[in-house]
Amino acid sequence: MLYRTMGSTGVEVSALGFGCMRLPVIGAKAQDIDYPLATEMIHHAIENGVNYVDTAWFYHAENFGQPGQSEPFVGQALSDGWRERVNLATKLPQQILKTREDMDVFLNRQLERLQTDHIDFYLIHGLTGEAWDRVRDLGVLEFLDKAREDGRIRFPAFSFHGQAADFPRIIDSYDWAFGQIQYNYMDVDYQAGTAGLRYAAEKGVGIVVMEPLKGGKLATNLPSEAQAVFDRAAVKRTPPEWALRFVWNEPGVSLALSGMSAMEHVVENLRIADQALPDSLTPEELGLYGEVRVAIKSRIKADCTACGYCQPCPSGVEIPRVLAALNASAMWEDANPGLSGYTQVKGGASLCTECGQCEEMCPQGLPIRDLMKETAALFGR
């Protein structure tokens, strides 16, 4: 495992972080984590050098906004001495905060759920410019100062889902350990993007990358045109390796989180992380990413990462699964609902009443109502 320094904190973190948003589950319910398998995976990662584990209040909840099962799982998985071997990160659920007092309530509950007396990196979850202004006015900076002073957290940070212009403003507002951004070879100009990443690095602020595989989409099912571009490279790599090496090539990236849901994901990511050197890609290899980007963007319909923030839909539409089917159909140029996975979607696009609630919650800013119409027309329901 290779290690990098987290911003200006002096803390050495593994290039690969274990994200606990997409743990293996038993059945179809997000809250039913497969404890034995997920524990085996996280222990294997730690034994092979991973020293950073990321979770959040909402992860593995039945519906977004509810307390999920990821934090309790992590607390149990890191018991019996494993906690001391990692840097633990979780997040303040700013989306449901109403008062300054709520911040202490949530942090204290998270410490209990995680079975620990402190959190190494405590993030404000999912900031946009508007959300930042709101929580700042609620007193979040005073809260973070107090939590650092009393030892409940070591370093403050934030995750970001806003517009590019808001990222530097937030970076400059406080003494952050890092900003966590969505970044991969498809999202170089999306949200904070490469410009935001490099701005943070210039300021001595670390960068943690989420969605380096774009919710798994860059690991499997690449369009044939995109795969053909990578196949021209002198050095042959798997799709996940191309994706992760792009992220790790940036010197300003402190670590990349991967939400691993199977042991084979852990094994492959550990292998790739052993070669995670900055500035290690050749100019020719970097040029291939631009070609792949064009090939993929010419096909997909919705830049959805399946984060689940749009759920539950009041009308019962399974929005991430609907969009996944739409994209699969577009990528393979086939409207066969079986091939795209649409036959397994119970809450189809035709249930949409165009209330717009999903679009208000979507971190990607997708025109979900229009996409539901398109999907219903394509698949007939």
Model-derived segments and spans:
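N-terminal binding-site loop/beta-alpha segment at the start of enzyme catalytic domains
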Residues: 1-86
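Conserved, mostly hydrophobic/aromatic
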Residues: 6, 18, 45, 53, ...
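Local beta-strand N-terminus motif with an aromatic residue
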Residues: 13, 53, 85-86, 116-119, ...
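Conserved residues at the C-terminal ends of beta-strands
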Residues: 19, 56-59, 122-125, 159, ...
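Structured C-terminal cap/extension of enzyme domains
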Residues: 41, 46, 51, 195-381
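Short catalytic-loop micro-motif centered on adjacent basic/acidic residues
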Residues: 52-58, 154-158, 180-181, 255-257, ...
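Glycine/proline-rich, positively charged
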Residues: 94-210, 221-227, 234-235, 249
